[in-house]
Amino acid sequence: SPKSLFIKDIQIYKLDKTKILFYEENKVSYIIKSLKSSLLNNNKDIKLEGNVRLYDLNNKANTINANKAFWNIDKYEFTLIGDVILNNNSIKVESSKAILNKKENIIKFFKPVKYRYLNNSSDLNYKVKADNAYYDLNKQNLLFESKNARIKSNLNF
């Protein structure tokens, strides 16, 4: 961060233009950027705000955008809140909230979920609406779930 401020009374670091690198086996696997962030609870929690972007370096096509994100450093879960969008070369998934579980490498998108298949070489237009969706980063597959309502699909040729 190019600018940081430590507030001693409440033990919080405030940072601007944050860039966080996540390592797995001494190799960068994710990069997270935001306009500002705070280190809370004796540096155990990170709160990111403003144009939060997560880049998956294991699959460079995957990017996730959100308004805010929270991460407890001791846990494997990263919570994204507000206008959450997963993009890659073939899909776009949108929801108001998502949780990335790093241990399982699965992203759970919460109600309401909108999905769109992206393929520029085809006239196929495929849309799905569901309560929840689960995206497996390793297998690159997507599972939809609705508890009380039917999953709505729309195919246009």
List the model feature ranges, each with a label.
Residues 1-157:
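Mature-chain termini and adjacent capping regions
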